[in-house]
């Protein structure tokens, strides 16, 4: 499966200087969806969660776009779970960890 966007790392954090990991912010997702307005997109999610505020913004952006298919590909918890609820479809690979 080819994913157009992967939501990973901590939600609401662009870059975690402590761990050196990149996260995903609402601005990043909105920018991607704006560039792909009117197109059907496949978005993968593997995130421990994070900011509720950013998660809600991402949820709304995905819902407003209307053509997002979400794929849970790894651990998806907390804020990363409810942002998927705005999608056209939500799919899980074999043995994902949703919490």
Please report, for each region that a protein language model flagged, where it lies by residue.
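Terminal-region recognition feature
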Residues: 1-99
């Amino acid at each position: 499966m080819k994913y157009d966007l992967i939501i990973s790392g901590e939600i609401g954090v662009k870059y975690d200087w402590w761990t050196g990991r990149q996260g995903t912010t609402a601005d990043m997702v909105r920018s991607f969806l704006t560039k792909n307005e009117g197109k059907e997109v496949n978005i993968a999610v593997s995130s421990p969660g994070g900011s509720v505020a950013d998660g809600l913004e991402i949820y709304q952006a995905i819902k407003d776009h209307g053509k997002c298919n979400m794929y849970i590909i790894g651990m998806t918890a907390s804020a990363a779970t409810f942002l998927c609820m705005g999608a056209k479809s939500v799919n899980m690979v074999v043995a994902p960890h949703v919490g």
